């Protein structure tokens, strides 16, 4: 249920865009992302850092988009978020010695540190590619294609990369953990 709730702002953005325009969709995105944050606080008495970070960026870029009536800002948001995610993974690992991917998944999956480092680098590269692809699509193709790319293209790419990361990690798990997962 919690994962579904994370997709609600994206679904609302797409639906409002299809019936109205980018500015109404952006306004709806800001409002629904804020409601999502409030729901997390009310339901779980906790707001994830990533959720708050995303809300702040959506609010900032979305607010600029609506205020100036210029879709350039909301288009840049996707790239900024992806590049900041990539930088966060790299700086955390190589600046502070903490692998964020391992911190998120390491309790459930026991893989060697070099494997976690490759997965971390892979995700940093993935986020960078997504940010660059977004720039290309946002500023070289029609707005409707960008919206479809943002909603379906990036989501599909993320699901595929998540699956590939899982397969890669699984290959490097200890045999006893693999056997446990098969049960």
Swiss-Prot record:
Keywords: Cell inner membrane, Cell membrane, Membrane, Transmembrane, Transmembrane helix. Signal peptide: none annotated. Its main location: membrane. InterPro entries: YciB. The chain crosses the membrane at residues 4-24, 50-70, 72-92, 119-139, 149-169. It is found in: Cell inner membrane. One of its GO terms (cellular component) is plasma membrane. It is a multi-pass membrane protein. Pfam families: IspA. Belongs to the YciB family. Plays a role in cell envelope biogenesis, maintenance of cell envelope integrity and membrane homeostasis. This is Inner membrane-spanning protein YciB. It comes from Aeromonas hydrophila subsp. hydrophila (strain ATCC 7966 / DSM 30187 / BCRC 13018 / CCUG 14551 / JCM 1027 / KCTC 2358 / NCIMB 9240 / NCTC 8049). The gene is yciB.
